[in-house]
Swiss-Prot record:
Name of this chain's protein: PiggyBac transposable element-derived protein 5
Composition bias type Basic and acidic residues, residue spans: 97-107
Tissue specificity annotation: Expressed in the brain (at protein level).
Enzyme Commission number, as recorded: 3.1.-.-
Chain spans, region Disordered: 30-116
GO biological process terms, semicolon-separated: non-replicative DNA transposition
Gene (UniProt): Pgbd5
Its job: Transposase that mediates sequence-specific genomic rearrangements.
Enzyme class: hydrolase
Keyword line: Endonuclease, Hydrolase, Nuclease, Nucleus, Phosphoprotein, Transposition
Cellular-component GO terms for this entry: nucleoplasm; nucleus
Length: 523
C-alpha cells in the first residue's frame, strides 16, 4: 500500500525553501500587471471558468475537514486487501512506488526576439497584428462595403477606409478595455466616459460607418463550411505570431480563461438590459504558459451549428474536452512539456496518448466530471476510515500515478510528469504547511499563478459587445494579443526605460494607434 502521513504541519525551513525555489520561474507573478488586488490564489484548486467554478466541489467529495486530535500524528489508512488485489490484477495498477525523474527540458523559454529599449506599445502589439494583417482588413472592409451597397443601395456618406483609419478604429475599440465602458460611442458622448483628445481623431459618424462595414473576411468561399470562416484567417495569423514571438516554459495549463461579463457592468445593468443580451455561442480554450501567463494557443468551439471537426455531434463533455486538448497540443509533441489540466480534460487514455507524443500531464480528477475509464475503482471512492489533513494514497501503472490526497476534502490527481516518491508541501498563510506528493504541490503552484493572472487579466478584456459571434471572437482574440504584448514588453529592455502598468500600457497603445503619441516609451 502507498500512503502518506500528515505529520506535523510545520516543516523544516530547508523543505520550505526548496518548495519556494522550485517555482522561482514564475518570475513576473503578482506584478504582471504592475498593480495588486484581490485574487483567487488562496485556493490552489480554483477553476478559472465560470462554469467550472460553479461546480468546483465536484473535484472534492468531502469538504468537511477531519483534523487529527491535538498532539497526535494523523491516522494511517489501510487499504482493504481485496481492493488492493482488484487494483493490481484488474487494470495493472500497483501500490509499489518507484522513483523516477521528471521529463527533461533543455529549451530556454521566453521572447524569441530582442526588442530595442525604444520599442513602443504598438511595436509589441504589431508582433501579433502587423500592418499586412491590418491592410487585409482594409481591403476586406472596402470590398464588403462595395458589395453591400450594390445589393442594398448606395451609401453616399461612405468613403473607403485607409490603413491609418483602421488602426484608429482598433484603437477606439481597444480603449474600452481600459475605460471598462461597454459602449465605445461614449468617447464622443460628452459624459463620464467621454475623451475629447481621442474624439478629435475621428468623428463618431465615421467610426460608426467603419463599424458597420468592418470585416476580416468579406465573403465565404465555395469550399468553406467552417462557422468561423469570417475570423479564422485572423486567428491563424495570430497563432503564427504567438509561435514566432515566444517560446513557452516547460509547464503549461489548458483551461477556459475568464471571459464572462464584467461584474461591475452586471451589477449596474437593469433587468431588461440583461434579458436583451444574448449568451455567447462559443467557448474559448487556451494553452497558457504557467511561468509567465503568455497564451500560447487559442481554440474556439462553436456551441451551435455543425462543423467539419464534428465536435457538435459529441454529447459527452469529457470526450469533447479531450478533442479540444488534442487540438491545443497539436504543436506540442516531442518537447517534454508538462501540461496541467482540469477535471473535464483529465483522463488515463488521453494522458497515455500524449505520453507517446512526448507530452506529459498532471491533472485534477473528478469521479463525476472526468473520464475515469481504466482507473481502479477503489481509488475513486472515499475510504471508510477518515483521513487526516495531508494524508494520501497512491497507485501506479507504468509512469502513471493516481493520487488521492486529503485537504478539507478528497482531491484526486492523475500524472505521469512527477515521481510518486517525491514529497512536496502546500504553504498556507494561516494553517501552516500541509504535506503532499510533489505532483500536488506543482499543480497548486502553477494553477494558483494562472488564477491570479486571470483575475487581473480578465479586467482588460475589450468591453465592446457586438452581436455577431465572429466579431465577439475577434475582439476576444485582440484582447489576448494585447495581454501577450504586455508580457513581452515586461520581459524586454523597453520596460526598464519606462515601467508601465497594464492599464498604462493599454492607454499608451490606444494613443499610438490613433497617432496621438510618439512611438518611443522614452518620451
Amino acid at each position: 500500500m502507498a500512503e502518506g502521513g500528515g505529520g506535523s504541519r510545520r516543516r523544516a525551513p530547508a523543505l520550505l525553501e526548496a518548495a519556494r525555489a522550485r517555482y522561482e520561474s514564475l518570475h513576473i507573478s503578482d506584478d504582471v500587471f504592475g498593480e495588486s488586488g484581490p485574487d483567487s490564489g488562496g485556493n490552489p484548486f480554483y477553476s478559472t471558468s465560470a462554469a467550472s467554478r460553479s461546480s468546483s466541489a465536484a473535484s472534492s467529495d468531502d469538504e468537511r475537514e477531519r483534523p487529527a486530535p491535538p498532539g497526535t500524528a494523523p491516522p494511517s489508512y489501510a487499504a482493504d486487501p481485496l481492493e488492493l488485489e482488484e487494483d493490481e490484477t484488474g487494470g495493472g495498477w500497483s501500490a509499489v512506488l518507484r522513483d523516477r525523474p521528471s521529463p527533461r527540458f533543455e529549451d530556454t523559454g521566453g521572447p524569441t526576439r530582442k526588442m530595442p529599449p525604444s520599442a513602443s506599445a504598438v511595436d509589441f502589439f504589431q508582433l501579433f497584428v502587423p500592418d499586412n494583417v491590418l491592410k487585409n482588413m482594409v481591403v476586406q472592409t472596402n470590398m464588403y462595403a462595395r458589395k453591400f451597397q450594390e445589393r442594398f443601395g448606395s451609401d453616399g456618406a461612405w468613403v473607403e477606409v485607409t490603413l491609418a483609419e483602421m488602426k484608429a478604429f482598433l484603437g477606439y475599440v481597444i480603449s474600452t478595455s481600459v475605460s471598462h465602458c461597454e459602449s465605445v460611442l461614449s468617447i464622443w458622448s460628452g459624459g463620464f466616459y467621454s475623451n475629447r483628445s481621442l474624439a478629435l481623431v475621428m468623428s463618431q459618424a465615421r467610426f460608426e460607418k467603419i463599424l458597420k462595414y468592418f470585416h476580416v473576411v468579406a465573403f465565404r468561399s465555395s469550399q468553406t463550411t467552417h462557422g468561423l470562416y469570417k475570423v479564422q484567417p485572423f486567428l491563424d495569423s495570430l497563432q503564427s505570431g504567438f509561435d514566432a514571438a515566444f517560446r513557452p516554459s516547460q509547464t503549461q495549463v489548458l483551461h477556459e480563461p475568464l471571459i464572462d461579463e464584467d461584474p461591475v457592468f452586471i451589477a449596474t445593468c437593469t433587468e431588461r438590459e440583461l434579458r436583451k443580451r444574448k449568451k455567447r455561442k462559443f467557448s474559448l480554450w487556451v494553452r497558457q504558459c504557467s511561468s509567465t501567463g503568455f497564451i500560447i494557443q487559442i481554440y474556439v468551439h462553436l456551441k451551435e451549428g455543425g462543423g467539419p471537426d464534428g465536435l457538435d455531434a459529441l454529447k459527452n463533455k469529457p470526450q469533447l474536452h479531450s478533442m479540444v486538448a488534442r487540438s491545443l497540443c497539436r504543436n506540442a509533441a516531442g518537447k517534454n512539456y508538462i501540461i496541467f489540466t482540469g477535471p473535464s480534460i483529465t483522463s488515463l487514455n488521453l494522458f497515455e496518448e500524449f505520453e507517446k507524443q512526448g507530452i506529459y500531464c498532471c491533472g485534477l480528477l473528478s469521479s463525476r466530471k472526468s473520464d475515469c475509464t481504466g482507473l481502479p475503482p477503489s481509488m475513486l471512492t472515499n475510504p471508510a476510515t477518515p483521513l487526516a489533513r495531508g494524508q494520501h494514497q497512491i497507485r501506479t501503472k507504468g509512469n502513471m500515478s493516481l493520487i488521492c490526497w486529503y485537504n478539507k476534502g478528497h482531491f484526486r490527481f492523475l500524472t505521469n510528469a512527477y515521481s510518486p516518491v517525491q514529497k512536496g508541501v502546500i504553504i498556507k498563510r494561516r494553517s501552516g504547511e500541509i504535506p503532499c506528493p510533489l505532483a500536488v504541490e506543482a499543480f497548486a503552484a502553477h494553477l494558483s499563478y494562472i488564477c491570479r493572472y486571470d483575475d487581473k487579466y480578465s479586467k482588460y478584456f475589450i468591453s465592446h459587445k457586438p452581436n455577431k459571434t465572429w466579431q465577439q471572437v475577434f475582439w476576444f482574440a485582440i484582447s489576448i494579443a494585447v495581454n501577450n504584448a504586455y508580457i513581452l514588453y515586461k520581459m524586454s529592455d523597453a520596460y526598464h526605460v519606462k515601467k508601465y502598468s497594464r492599464a498604462q500600457f493599454g492607454e499608451r497603445l490606444v494613443r499610438e494607434l490613433l497617432g496621438l503619441e510618439d512611438s518611443s516609451p522614452a518620451h
